Amino acid sequence: VLVSNNYEGALVDLLKSIKVKEITIARNGLYLSDYENIVLAMVSSSIKISVNKANIDNIRIAKEKEEIKIIRDNLNRKAMTKTLAFIKENITERELAAELEYQMRKEGGDKTAFDTILLFVERTSLPHGMPTDRKLKLGDNILMDFGLSREGYKSDITRTFFFGKGNNFKEMSKIYNVVKEAHKKGIEAIHSGISGKEADNSAREIIKSNGYGKYFGHSLGHGVGLEIHEAPRLSPIIDNVLEGGTIVTVEPGIYIPDLGGVRIENMVIVTKDGGVSMNDTPTDLIVL
């Protein structure tokens, strides 16, 4: 760890000490001023510098064992389980999201990996909705999409719960089981060498065949690591090939306006023998 109020100079000193003559950096993720300062420091020290975002992103796709361990540890902390104990009638989306984020901090998270999505009843049909002062009522469903960041690495998980059985429980439980089956098929399809498009299609066909195709409007998943969204993509329009050691999300969903939505999301390691879920939380339908 370098501690300095002149990190460009400290970086140059480090590179010189190990006799580095040329470096490649990724422009994305840097403030323009930081990027310019690094370039100027390298030029003045005669260290060659080049920018190649694509190659650096590609190097990051397959994760090393230590990276996988950090991400797995991030996923399997108990913030969600502890938050469920706080669920009660009339709690707001905002209050429950705050409790979940507090529990993630208590569980060792440095910060949230992204803005927590926590929604009730018909608002669960918004794939990326933000918490409001909407109050929870008996019979509502609850969608939680959250993750923590620790040591720079992100986690991403979604679960949908039911707070009792409301008037729409029969239809929503049917939707839940379709999403659960699509989630299972998506994970089963994954292995090194498959394309993101093929993986997406394996889950999407389950949803289409049950008559909900038009209500699944996003890709099946994405890579996760130092960024919450990184390569590769599991998408109907992108043909990237999955390689071993990659970590991706599998997150099918069905979202029906004015009724509600269901999404189930796990993070999955790609291996030559198949996709291996990193989560230890169940995907069974749970009525609280």
Predicted regions and their residues:
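Active-site neighborhoods and metal-handling regions in enzymes and metal-associated proteins
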Residues: 1-288
